[in-house]
């Protein structure tokens, strides 16, 4: 049975009760429980807590719902308000990249749309992927295609290859919504989401966090599998912070190439005070 002074217990109000009176009722209820509990520690602590609780609730910030006090836009450590929105953003911008070899063997990877100019007017979208997603089909060994979520095939052409950072830019006839690039780099503990064609399953999603990072690599706890390579690594606002690139057998982390790594050949970047700024 919940204590009547439990500050996490929501009150029931008549449907026609004004919002201002609801807030005042919450203040009275929480004030009793909060002040009584903290006053055992210090009368001053109880009084200060009472003032903060009252002000927060009255002005529309219900402290008993602590999650609402943290905005993902300004805090990379918290989960997004609506993870489904982040999944939808990725879904509209991520593709499967297929390499079919002459012996009919098939390899799959992923790619994500970026706001860069395609190589010619024939193509509608620019896409980032991994170098190793494409290299089985180099030298006319096979045919590369871009596949949408319904596995419809689209033409593509390779624009830029960066073997050192295992990255590539391609253009395709598929029409995609470009993903936004994160305005800042990640830090250990940041929330992340991977999206791609894990083990051939289109639209696979996993959540995790940044374990650590270097200038060019991001180590993540989110699960990835063969086929995730080239897909986007997203933050809690749906912005790209990296490109999923490799996994560690028997370890608890996987890896992505950061946006900074794209500055070598793909992005036009400025370097200032030890940091890259991409355009």
Regions found by a protein language model. Name each.
Residues 1-27:
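N-terminal targeting leaders characterized by basic, low-complexity, disordered sequences
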Residues 8-15, 59-60, 65-76, 81-87, ...:
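C-terminal cap/linker of serine protease catalytic domains
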Residues 23-49:
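N-terminal Sec-pathway targeting helices
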Residues 59-71, 86, 108, 115-164:
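Catalytic-histidine neighborhood of serine endopeptidases
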Residues 85-86, 112-113, 117, 136-138, ...:
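Active-site substrate-binding loop(s) of clan PA
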Residues 88-104, 110, 192:
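A short, Trp-centered hydrophobic/proline-enriched beta-strand micro-motif
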Residues 112, 224-244:
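Catalytic nucleophile loop of clan PA
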Residues 177-228, 244-255:
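Flexible, gly/ser-rich surface segments that form the specificity/activation loops bordering the active-site cleft
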């Amino acid at each position: 049975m919940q204590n009547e002074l439990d500050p996490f217990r929501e009150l029931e109000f008549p449907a026609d009760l004004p919002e201002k009176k609801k807030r005042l009722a919450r203040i009275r209820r929480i004030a009793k429980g909060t002040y009584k509990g903290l006053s055992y520690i210090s009368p001053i602590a109880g009084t200060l807590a009472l003032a903060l609780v009252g002000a927060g609730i009255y002005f529309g910030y219900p402290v008993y719902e602590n999650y609402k006090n943290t905005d993902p836009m300004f805090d990379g450590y918290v989960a997004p308000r609506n993870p489904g929105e982040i999944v939808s953003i990725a879904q509209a911008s991520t593709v499967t990249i297929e390499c079919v070899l002459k012996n009919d063997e098939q390899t799959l990877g992923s790619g994500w749309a970026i706001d860069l100019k395609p190589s010619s007017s024939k193509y509608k979208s620019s896409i980032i992927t991994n170098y190793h997603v494409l290299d089985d089909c180099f030298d006319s060994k096979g045919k590369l295609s871009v596949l949408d979520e319904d596995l419809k095939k689209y033409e593509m052409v390779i624009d830029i290859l960066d073997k050192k950072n295992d990255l590539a830019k391609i253009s395709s006839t598929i029409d995609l919504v470009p993903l936004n690039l994160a305005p800042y780099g990640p830090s250990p503990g940041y929330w992340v989401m991977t999206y791609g064609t894990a083990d051939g399953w289109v639209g696979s999603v996993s959540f995790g966090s940044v374990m650590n990072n270097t200038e060019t690599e991001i180590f993540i706890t989110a699960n990835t599998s063969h086929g995730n390579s080239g897909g986007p690594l997203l933050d809690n606002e749906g912005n790209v912070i990296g490109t999923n690139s490799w996994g560690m057998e028997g370890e608890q982390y996987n890896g992505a190439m950061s946006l900074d790594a794209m500055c070598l050949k793909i992005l036009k970047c400025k370097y200032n005070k030890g940091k890259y700024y991409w355009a």
